[in-house]
Amino acid sequence: MRRIARAFAVSSLLVLGACSASGGDSADSGSDTTAASDTTAAGSVDSGKFGDMDSPCGPGNATVDPTQNGGPTLKVATPTDKGFTALPGLDIELEDAAKAFIGWCNKQGGVQGVQLELVETDAALLQVPAAMEKMCAEAFAMVGGGLVFDDQEFPRFHECKMIDIPGYTVTATKAESDGKVEPVPNPSNVKPTGWLLWAKENRAADLAKPLFLAGNAVTTKNVALQLKSSWEVVGGLGAEPEIIEYNSAGEASYAPYAQQIKDKGVTYLSFIGAPDTFIAVLKALDEIGYRPALIMNDGNFYDQQFASKAGASADGVIARTAYASFENPDKFPAMQQFLDIMAKYNPSGKIAGLGLQSFSAYLLFATAVNKCVETNNNVIERECVLESAKAITSWTGGGLHTETNPSEGKPSTCGALMVAEEGTFKRLFPEIGSADDNSNGWHCWENGIADIPGDFGDVSKGKDPSRGS
């Protein structure tokens, strides 16, 4: 069951689309680290700003629509699958970042003077309908969360007129749904291509024999197909990639897959699945003395636990990200402040990439609430907040990630590449401050996103034409 859980967990890789967050998207994305010291936190954590943006929190006289679970507090739900017994704590970093944000925001007076209250919501992977019922009954909005089987939120999501500013989305149903705005958009048919363009320019010879090793679950198969479609749209990347599927529930041995990789003379490898599973593949390759010249993976592999557990086996594995790097907080003030806020307001919370995505979602939600209150007679109302969020055309989460356009709903053309070395991650591209750094720590490609053809899942369930996308 634990192997099954990890296979399901990878379904949320994207977030930055990820990021595909996004961007890429990832259940295990980001570098797990420790929070800053209380001494560091005390200096800037409550400065009235976050990174390069003014804090959206503070005093006011707003009220919450009483017909939308309104009351003396603004009730928000950050759904996770933390209670899945085979993998306890799945995506708990989303909720941990939410708790830190709420503590930080309430210290400043809440949002427009209304204190935030967290409605803890656990879908435990397989209990999404029950979790959705709870949120409909108790929460004003869903903020900063994400569920592996997010397509199961519907139709109840629309029936109760819920709104969502998610940390990440997984399925095409959710990614293309109405009633939500993503801080780092992850549409199913538009994907970042910057990492492929980098490989084309810098490692062309290593693209001669590409292979994608993907889990056979529907979600991971769709990600592999999306990557293959992106590869074909970019063009000039060598031969057509072959996709080999492994059992998402786990294999007794990955030696046969390693042998196939060697026998085929694979020069380029992308793995679609959970980092722990890939460690087994890498070690199987080590045992037969074979290594593809270039290994590039999505954002869920930018994970310090992956690098440290894999050790030398992970050396050279490249992962893309659209978020500030944990390893360089001195270069990214928003990252340093995020660590400070975690240290002060949730010191025992897990710090990882999904937490950054959740925090950005909360910042966007609070910003949208402020805009709504200005035009809605001081009343915080769902559709008003949703429309205010949709109107935001430039967003970086205060500098937590590359610039996105939530209104347009497309991924960023910018990003960075991290490479595993000696049990940790180091920046590969762009070097901060170099000519390649053309966007405050990231590189933006002229053709950094692409429309990709293909059917990656049923989008109709997430649609409610009365609400708009």
What are these language model-derived features?
Residues D46, G58-T73, A77-K99, T121-A124, ...:
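Extracytoplasmic "Venus flytrap"
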Residues A139-E245, A293-I318:
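Extracytoplasmic ligand/sensor domains, especially the bilobed periplasmic-binding protein
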Residues N216, K228, P275-A280, F326-A389:
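Extracellular/periplasmic ligand-binding modules, especially the Venus flytrap/periplasmic-binding
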Residues L285-S360, E431, D458, G462-S466:
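Extracellular/periplasmic periplasmic-binding protein-like sensory domains
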